From Swiss-Prot:
Gene3D superfamilies: Translational regulator CsrA (2.60.40.4380). It is found in: Cytoplasm. This is Translational regulator CsrA. GO terms for biological process: mRNA catabolic process; negative regulation of translational initiation; positive regulation of translational initiation; regulation of carbohydrate metabolic process. It comes from Psychromonas ingrahamii (strain DSM 17664 / CCUG 51855 / 37). Belongs to the CsrA/RsmA family.
Length: 58
């Protein structure tokens, strides 16, 4: 796992088309913004796991 340190307003790049920006930090919560092409799905992990469970339950 790559571990990076970013400050509010700083961005990291994933490939050529995806950016992740730190929008704010409040206590133990971090707000991030993700810019990605429409064909790239972006989900919180718990939502992604629910989608996968629903797919395998069909």
């Amino acid at each position: 796992m790559l571990i990076l340190t970013r400050r509010v307003g700083e961005t990291l790049m994933i490939g050529d088309n995806v950016t992740v920006t730190v929008l704010g930090v409040k206590g133990n919560q971090v707000r991030i913004g993700v810019n990605a092409p429409k064909e790239v799905s972006v989900h919180r992990e718990e939502i992604y796991m629910r989608i996968q469970a629903e797919k395998s339950g069909e």
